[in-house]
Amino acid sequence: MDASTKVKKGAGGRKGGGPRKKAVTRSVRAGLQFPVGRIGRFLKKGRYAQRVGTGAPVYLAAVLEYLAAEVLELAGNAARDNKKNRISPRHLLLAVRNDVELGKLLAGVTIAYGGVLPNINPVLLPKRTESAASAPKSPSKAKKTPKKA
């Protein structure tokens, strides 16, 4: 063999020995944050079917990402309503149970340290009388007199 004709190593069977391109993950291609490759691996490893199509993990990752974003947005709103900066399991429970569709989807799910929804049966509430209903709830501001020092 001639010294001028060297065999390039590291091409890995690819044509051309130029600089290697940066790998682009399937999550980036699909514009997702959830890991498409890992979900595909779990689908194959779990033996849910003999074969798994190439689009199945992408679709499943998109669905899971949407559900996570929906729950987190509602839980963030619940945390803000309670004047908190951190989402707690209580906020997750309030978010899920106050949303009709998520409540139906997660009907049999128990959230640890979530508590229960605040609910008082109307029968247990004190009855309103007619005189209390007609009277104003708070005195008007015109009747108040300023305090004298």
UniProtKB/Swiss-Prot annotation:
GO terms for cellular component: nucleosome; nucleus. Residues 140-149 have a biased composition (Basic residues). The keyword Cell wall biogenesis/degradation does not apply. One of its GO terms (molecular function) is DNA binding. The modification N-acetylmethionine is found at M1. Residues 1-24, 128-149 are annotated as: Disordered. CDD domains: HFD_H2A. It is found in: Nucleus; Chromosome. A motif (SPKK motif) lies at residues 138-141. Pfam families: Histone (PF00125), Histone_H2A_C (PF16211). InterPro entries: Histone-fold, Histone_H2A, Histone_H2A/H2B/H3, Histone_H2A_C, Histone_H2A_CS. Keywords: Acetylation, Chromosome, DNA-binding, Nucleosome core, Nucleus. The nucleosome is a histone octamer containing two molecules each of H2A, H2B, H3 and H4 assembled in one H3-H4 heterotetramer and two H2A-H2B heterodimers. The octamer wraps approximately 147 bp of DNA. Belongs to the histone H2A family. PANTHER family: HISTONE H2A. Contains one SPKK motif which may interact with the minor groove of A/T-rich DNA sites. Phosphorylation of this motif may regulate DNA binding. This motif is reiterated in both termini of histone H1 and in the N-terminus of sea urchin histones H2B, but its presence in the C-terminus seems to be unique to plant H2A. Core component of nucleosome. Nucleosomes wrap and compact DNA into chromatin, limiting DNA accessibility to the cellular machineries which require DNA as a template. Histones thereby play a central role in transcription regulation, DNA repair, DNA replication and chromosomal stability. DNA accessibility is regulated via a complex set of post-translational modifications of histones, also called histone code, and nucleosome remodeling. This is Histone H2A.2. It comes from Pisum sativum (Garden pea). The lineage of its organism: Eukaryota, Viridiplantae, Streptophyta, Embryophyta, Tracheophyta.
